[in-house]
Regions:
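Conserved H-loop
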Residues: 184-190
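Conserved ABC ATPase "signature" region
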Residues: 59-64, 108-126, 177-178
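ABC ATPase NBD coupling module
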Residues: 61-78, 102
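Short coil-to-helix segment of the ABC ATPase nucleotide-binding domain corresponding to the Q-loop/switch region
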Residues: 90-99
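A short, proline-enriched helix->beta-strand linker immediately N-terminal to the Walker B motif
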Residues: 149-153
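Catalytic Walker B motif of ABC-type/P-loop ATPase nucleotide-binding domains
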Residues: 155-159
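Conserved ABC ATPase signature
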Residues: 130-134, 138-140
């Protein structure tokens, strides 16, 4: 289980968020500037909260009370960035392997191979190409493959579909659901897209100006808050100034 209690003050916004999440895909939904990416960065160890507590399956990543701050490289977290963050001078295969310890590259103490990940994401035929030769969807699959190569205990995704065309977006939505089912680790995805939220979320946190407005759990959806089947003409679910 991911347990997060994060306080972080930034120019123009104060983030105060607390939540627990166990399985499936958690979507953090909110407008631009609401603090979504900062929350991911705090979980990943790329930014330190001002105070709070972050743990995963009992392993404490950050605790202001106990003066604990685990380095990002030791957290076993996969992170897919909004801009792909691929190295232009490296091939797809080398991008995927970047940062993997040398003993793992030789197959020692490592459960998954590069070809396994390439095949899983249907990009084996691209392994010797460079990022400039890839489409947006191919770049995103490469970024996903790199995040999975570290065998993460949780996967963070920052607006992973925002730059893709409709066809690639629909395809990757299905692939993300299948990846989560196969890997059986929590996914935390942030988006400002209502359609992505409907397509992907098992649980939803509505974020507004750095604060959690509502946490929608699976049992709430089963009880009648069926967000996935809402249409443009349906009553909207309003959360402090924006609707879904």
């Amino acid at each position: 289980m991911l347990s997060a209690n994060i306080t972080k003050r930034l120019p123009g916004i104060s983030i105060e968020v607390s939540f627990d999440f166990d399985r499936g895909i958690l979507v953090i939904f909110g407008p631009s500037g609401s603090g979504k990416t900062t929350i991911l960065n705090c979980i990943a160890g790329l930014r330190e909260p001002d105070k709070g507590h972050i743990s995963l399956d009992g392993r404490v990543f950050y605790s202001s009370a106990d003066h604990i701050s685990t380095p990002a490289r030791s957290r076993r977290i996969g992170y897919v960035f909004q801009d792909y963050a691929l190295f232009p001078h490296l091939t797809v295969k080398d991008n995927i392997m970047y940062g993997i310890p040398s003993q793992c590259k030789k197959g020692k103490n490592y459960r998954i191979g590069t070809l396994d990940v390439l095949e899983m994401l249907k990009i084996t035929h691209l392994q010797n190409r460079y990022p400039a030769q890839l489409s947006g969807g191919e770049k995103q699959r490469t970024a996903l493959a790199r995040a999975l190569m570290v065998e993460p205990d949780i996967l963070l995704l920052d607006e992973p579909l925002s730059a893709l065309d409709h066809g690639n977006r629909k395809a990757l939505q299905g692939e993300l659901r299948e990846l989560q089912r196969v890997w059986r680790i929590p996914f935390v995805l942030v988006t400002h897209s209502r359609k992505e939220m409907h397509a992907l979320a098992d649980e939803i946190i509505f974020l507004h100006k750095g604060k959690k407005e509502t946490h929608v759990f699976p049992d709430m959806r089963r009880a009648g808050l069926d967000l996935a089947n809402m249409s443009e003409s349906s009553p909207t679910y309003a959360v402090s100034g924006f609707t879904v």
